[in-house]
UniProtKB/Swiss-Prot annotation:
<dbReference type="GO" id="GO:0006310">
    <property type="term" value="P:DNA recombination"/>
</dbReference>
<keyword id="KW-0238">DNA-binding</keyword>
<feature type="active site">
    <location>
        <position position="172"/>
    </location>
</feature>
<dbReference type="InterPro" id="IPR011010">
    <property type="entry name" value="DNA_brk_join_enz"/>
</dbReference>
<dbReference type="GO" id="GO:0009009">
    <property type="term" value="F:site-specific recombinase activity"/>
</dbReference>
<comment type="similarity">
    <text>Belongs to the 'phage' integrase family. XerD subfamily.</text>
</comment>
<dbReference type="GO" id="GO:0071139">
    <property type="term" value="P:resolution of DNA recombination intermediates"/>
</dbReference>
<dbReference type="GO" id="GO:0005737">
    <property type="term" value="C:cytoplasm"/>
</dbReference>
<dbReference type="InterPro" id="IPR004107">
    <property type="entry name" value="Integrase_SAM-like_N"/>
</dbReference>
<dbReference type="Pfam" id="PF00589">
    <property type="entry name" value="Phage_integrase"/>
</dbReference>
<dbReference type="InterPro" id="IPR023009">
    <property type="entry name" value="Tyrosine_recombinase_XerC/XerD"/>
</dbReference>
<comment type="subunit">
    <text>Forms a cyclic heterotetrameric complex composed of two molecules of XerC and two molecules of XerD, in which XerC interacts with XerD via its C-terminal region, XerD interacts with XerC via its C-terminal region and so on.</text>
</comment>
<keyword id="KW-0159">Chromosome partition</keyword>
<dbReference type="GO" id="GO:0006313">
    <property type="term" value="P:DNA transposition"/>
</dbReference>
<feature type="domain" description="Tyr recombinase">
    <location>
        <begin position="108"/>
        <end position="292"/>
    </location>
</feature>
<dbReference type="InterPro" id="IPR044068">
    <property type="entry name" value="CB"/>
</dbReference>
<dbReference type="GO" id="GO:0009037">
    <property type="term" value="F:tyrosine-based site-specific recombinase activity"/>
</dbReference>
């Protein structure tokens, strides 16, 4: 079992070098694959002897045991990548994961806010306080750009150009993209940089654009708590909240106003158009409005 766990670490090291996966993804893979090794060990199996039927049984057992379909899909992805690696490195002469069946994932529509709700959320911070001025700027940037929360809290001073009105984002897979900020976000960034950030830094020299109260990089969890706080002030139902609520609103509202799907894909940093297409459910609302406005029998 120790040898198998060691091979998993070798695989994760190789995966990090080849794919530059996020630390959270690597840690999730480590947990999933360690669980798999333990499961195999209890059945007298190893990474060298496990067959396709064994791996399929593991996946089925996880699903029947209450594993979410998304968690099972992640486990399947980790298993496939591991055995592809073992086959490539000639540790095995076959790849038992090649024909594993994928668990069916329910298509969940992203939670989104109306434009009026977004406006209330953006107005919630008290801009006469440096901390809330920072939050105001963050919310404006988030809605203007559709960044992931992890991308937002990771921004540095060198990532923004207020003169050009763009932000440089290093997204998933270390892919870089430039996203327009818009006049409103630029205004609040300028205001924050003059009246908020110096107070938060209190003499500390760091390049982080949105530092915490301790002049450090803010965590995603901290910003999520801030969003929930302002949502309460704005009278927004918690059922509509998620860490990426403004990212979803960004995509939804762009499409509602006629933006091309591929443009939205580029702005969001999606590598696959199908990931962006889930937002097209909002087009129904836009079509209904157009129908009511222009059809003689509407």
């Amino acid at each position: 079992m120790k040898q198998d766990l060691a091979r998993i670490e070798q695989f994760l090291d190789a995966l990090w070098l080849e794919k530059n996966l996020a630390e959270n993804t690597l840690n999730a893979y480590r947990r999933d694959l360690s669980m798999m090794v333990e499961w195999l060990h209890h059945r007298g199996l190893t990474l060298a002897t496990a067959q396709s039927d064994d791996l399929q049984a593991l996946l089925a057992e996880r699903l029947e045991g209450g594993y979410k379909a998304t968690s099972s899909a992640r486990l399947l992805s980790a298993v496939r990548r591991l055995f592809q690696y073992l086959y490539r490195e000639k540790f095995r002469e076959d790849d038992p994961s090649a024909h594993l069946a994928s668990p069916k994932l329910p298509q969940r529509l992203p939670k989104d806010l109306s434009e009026a709700q977004v406006e209330r959320l953006l107005q919630a911070p008290l801009i006469d306080q440096p901390l809330e001025l920072r939050d105001k700027a963050m919310l404006e940037v988030l809605y203007a750009t559709g960044l992931r929360v992890s991308e937002l809290v990771g921004l540095t001073m060198s990532d923004i150009s207020l003169r050009q009105g763009v932000v440089r984002v290093i997204g998933k897979g270390n892919k870089e993209r430039l996203v327009p900020l818009g006049e409103e976000a630029v205004y609040w960034l300028e205001t924050y940089l003059e009246h908020g950030r110096p107070w938060l830094l209190n003499g500390v020299s760091i390049d982080v654009l949105f530092p915490s109260q301790r002049a450090q990089q803010m965590t995603r969890q901290t910003f999520w708590h801030r969003i929930k706080h302002y949502a309460v002030l704005a009278g927004i139902d918690s059922e509509k909240l998620s860490p990426h609520v403004l990212r979803h609103a960004f995509a939804t509202h762009l499409l509602n106003h006629g933006a091309d799907l591929r443009v939205v894909q580029m702005l969001l940093g999606h590598s696959d158009l199908s990931t962006t297409q889930i937002y097209t459910h909002v087009a129904t609302e836009r079509l209904r409005q157009l129908h009511q406005q222009h059809h003689p029998r509407a």
